[in-house]
Amino acid sequence: QECKCHVSGSCTLRTCWRALSDFRRTGDYLRRRMNGAVQVMATQDGANFTSARQGYRRATRTDLVYFDNSPDYCVLDKAAGSLGTAGRVCSKTSKGTDGCEIMCCGRGYDTTRVTRVTQCECKFHWCC
């Protein structure tokens, strides 16, 4: 909920409205929930589901659940529509998904130094 004071500035009268939470906060919350998701499989009658792994906790009503593991996007998988990451350009300094540590999936990577010479369209102006 967000509120704003009226013109007087004394906040004796405010207008409030419902608003979406910050996008980063929502994403962080979903990431935490996803990391705790429980893999399940359908029961024999198909009316319910149970934990897919013996000895793991049962899913609660508020847990995120999933049936199938995610595909391995590191390798070519035409059925999943993944071209893999081999041969792609990565950023050695980035810690994000474009960084070599993540994109190369532990396979290692080669570095190449590229030097580009370009015309800068610079002009010299005598000033003093």
Curated annotation (Swiss-Prot):
Protein name: Protein Wnt-2b-B
Superkingdom, taxonomy of origin: Eukaryota
Glycosylated residues (UniProt): N48
Statement: the UniProt record of this protein carries the keyword Transit peptide: no
Keyword Glycoprotein: yes
Principal localisation: secreted
Post-translational modification: Palmitoleoylation is required for efficient binding to frizzled receptors. Depalmitoleoylation leads to Wnt signaling pathway inhibition.
Described function: Ligand for members of the frizzled family of seven transmembrane receptors. Functions in the canonical Wnt/beta-catenin signaling pathway.
Gene name in the database record: wnt2b-b
The organism's taxonomic lineage, starting at the top: Eukaryota, Metazoa, Chordata, Craniata, Vertebrata
Biological-process GO terms, alphabetical: canonical Wnt signaling pathway; cell fate commitment; neuron differentiation
Organism of provenance: Xenopus laevis (African clawed frog)
GO MF: cytokine activity; frizzled binding
One GO cellular component term: extracellular space
Positions of disulphide bridges: C3-C16, C5-C11, C90-C105, C127-C128
Record keywords: Developmental protein, Disulfide bond, Extracellular matrix, Glycoprotein, Lipoprotein, Secreted, Wnt signaling pathway
InterPro entries: Wnt (IPR005817), Wnt_C (IPR043158)
Entry's family note: Belongs to the Wnt family.
Family annotation (SMART domains): WNT1 (SM00097)
Subcellular compartments: Secreted, Extracellular space, Extracellular matrix; Secreted
Lipid-substituted positions (O-palmitoleoyl serine): S8
